[in-house]
């Protein structure tokens, strides 16, 4: 199963970009041996619309253009449910075993995701009850994908 992290906004050079790239590279390396041959990041330009609902609609359209048919969608949203790292790894393992070819992880922009995307997602997760900057959520999602690969591959990175 291929994994694709889709985020609104382009990460500028610096710590955020480096951390995201590092965790996704590690996830790709760890995932190949356990049925996840690739992990990639796709960045979508932020909408310049004035109103939040218009921005979400435009960004949602751009996200939908990247979604593969019959893929599994995971949305990261502040209103999603909290899950621990082992539960997240179980989710990825079950998805891999379902026979689907692609899993998309969606991160909205400053206004969040278009409601139609969260409604169509198989899973909607939150990183706790706090609100996080979408660039930081990208790093956290990349790290949790890597952590899930290490849990599924019985690597000592995760020590819970």
Curated annotation (Swiss-Prot):
It comes from the Bacteria. GO terms for cellular component: cytoplasm. This is Ribosomal RNA large subunit methyltransferase H. Homodimer. Belongs to the RNA methyltransferase RlmH family. S-adenosyl-L-methionine binds at residues 108, 127-132. It is found in: Cytoplasm. Keywords: Cytoplasm, Methyltransferase, rRNA processing, S-adenosyl-L-methionine, Transferase. It is an enzyme of class 2 (transferase). GO terms for molecular function: rRNA (pseudouridine-N3-)-methyltransferase activity. It catalyses: pseudouridine(1915) in 23S rRNA + S-adenosyl-L-methionine = N(3)-methylpseudouridine(1915) in 23S rRNA + S-adenosyl-L-homocysteine + H(+). NCBIfam families: PRK00103.2-3. It holds the Pfam family SPOUT_MTase.
